[in-house]
Design a protein with these regions (language model features):
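Extended amphipathic, helix-rich lipid-handling scaffolds
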Residues: 1-228, 239-247, 251-354, 384-417, ...
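C-terminal structural cap/anchor segments
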Residues: 345-373
Length: 482
């Protein structure tokens, strides 16, 4: 059966309610739909201006290719199979306009794509089940989306006549299985991030304009997320993260973020953070961080960043971390050397700078709170730290049992991980020179990455980190395979 009123290129075959129909290619608003064919069982009610087709079971439309090419990151769907068993299609073949403006759909659909490609996605099959309503140029699609990796999400898509597209996605991610599905769906998942437990409710909205412009926003509500990133273990991460993309600038908000513990080798506990970030997508270090609240517990004391707006890169003062009453005794306990002892409380201020080369500290300062305390440093360890300088023997002797009233140090840290301490210590050793007052000026250096590696290998973080560090060292040839 041929309908003369239908645009050129259409052919319809009707036999006992069966229709085989080659559909024309559609090009509109950056979208391209090619290689489509309908094989349906239906009832047709036609008039001089339109036809209404009600599809029965086994009705399908196969599409070789659906693409959106007006973006720098194009979207491609291949080998789509759409089940129209419960859909009504209205063809206004007597109306003017494009086919996308003359075709309307309503009903329940099932869609399967053998492969979806996008720079942000791992290429794989996807399936969708939901409802469609509207003309193709102004279509609303709502339902459930599932990736071959197992990621499940609620999807809401609105197409507009000018070619714009609005997409809303919501997903609940639970435990290892949910995280594994997420990692196997998105290309940007960090290779060294492992999540063991917790949950996240994620939502995202994307709008692609007719001219190819992209606006995106999203949020994530985290609940007790625990895992390992690179060599650092974390536990109890909760809170809300907001993000939006506007004119190549990233805007992020962190609301009531809490972390029970972050442990790279020396644990930081009870972290609390609320703030906002704004910066260019191309170089996040050129952005600004507005801190509303930032505090944590560390070595029985506290760390705090004062509220304010800070430039991440190029700021002369860096981001100031205030250190309050950390325990020297606890610090000596976590240091990977036997025989270190100390007492007293340390406070000060450490400005942290960021660059493409890493983290730096310039002229940080720590000092002991009155009335001071006691230091005992083993001679062998101290001599090694001082480089075996025999001229420093008096320092080594004094620090075997030193009662200090003043302990102050500048702190510098470079991009390569070298920590430099310029210490000034005033006090006495009751067993040295009759307990005469002694003033010591000591310069110490420490390789912090090597120190943390030692702590991680000792099992002070957790077994997963120890195994990861050992594997990395073996791969780099720094540690022999046992």
């Amino acid at each position: 059966l041929t309908w003369p009123a239908v645009a050129a290129g259409w052919s319809l075959a009707v036999e006992q309610g069966k229709i085989g129909m080659a559909l024309p290619d559609i090009h509109t608003g950056g979208w391209a739909v090619t290689g489509s064919r309908a094989d349906v069982v239906s009832s047709v009610n036609a008039s001089g201006e339109s036809a209404v087709i009600r599809f029965n079971p086994t009705s399908t439309v196969a599409t070789e290719r659906l693409a959106y090419t007006d973006l720098e990151q194009p979207l491609l769907l291949q080998d789509l199979r759409t089940n129209l068993s419960h859909v009504t299609l209205t063809l206004d073949y007597g109306a003017s306009g494009t086919w996308a403006e003359r075709l309307a759909m309503e009903g329940e659909v099932k869609i399967e794509a053998s492969r979806i490609e996008h720079p942000l996605l791992v290429p794989q099959a996807w399936s969708f089940q939901g409802r469609v309503k509207g003309r193709l140029a102004n279509l609303r699609v709502q339902g459930s989306l599932v990736s071959a990796a197992g990621l499940k999400a609620s999807l809401d898509v609105q197409l507009y006549p000018d070619g714009a597209v609005a997409i809303s996605v919501d997903s609940a991610i639970e435990g290892q299985a949910g995280i594994r599905a997420l990692a196997e769906t998105f290309t940007g998942w960090p290779e060294l991030l492992t999540v063991d437990s917790g949950s996240a409710a994620v939502s995202a909205e994307v709008r692609m304009g007719p001219g190819g412009g992209l606006e995106a926003s999203g949020s994530s509500n985290l609940e007790k997320v625990t895992g390992v990133f690179n060599r650092t273990a974390f536990s109890g991460l909760s809170g809300r993260v907001l993000a939006s993309l506007e004119d190549d600038r990233l805007i992020a908000g962190f609301r009531d973020l809490t972390v029970e513990q972050v442990n790279p080798g020396i644990p930081v506990n009870a972290i609390r953070f609320t703030g906002d970030y704004t910066g260019p997508v191309a170089n996040t270090l050129e952005g600004q961080l507005e801190v509303q609240q930032a505090r944590a517990q560390f070595l029985e004391g506290a760390l705090r960043i004062p509220p304010g707006v800070y430039d991440l890169e190029g700021s002369s003062g860096g981001i100031p971390v205030e250190v309050q009453d950390i325990s020297l005794d606890r610090l000596m306990e976590v240091y990977p050397a036997e025989g270190l002892e100390g007492s007293g409380l340390l406070s000060g201020r450490i400005p942290i700078g960021f660059s493409g080369d890493g983290i730096q500290v310039a002229q940080g300062r720590l000092s002991a709170e009155a009335p001071g305390g006691r230091l005992r440093l083993p001679a062998e360890k101290l001599q090694a730290m001082l480089g075996g300088n025999q001229a420093m023997d008096v320092v080594v002797q004094a620090l075997q049992n030193f009662h200090y009233s003043v302990l102050a140090s500048t702190i510098d840290y470079d991009e390569k991980g070298k920590l430099t301490l310029d210490l000034r210590i005033e006090g006495k050793n009751p067993e040295l020179r009759g307990g005469q007052p002694v003033v010591l000026n000591v310069n110490l250096e420490e390789d912090i990455p090597a120190l943390l590696t030692s702590l991680q290998l000792s099992g002070r973080v957790n077994e997963a980190v120890t195994k990861r560090v050992r594997k990395l060292l073996q791969e780099s040839g720094e540690e022999a395979v046992p």
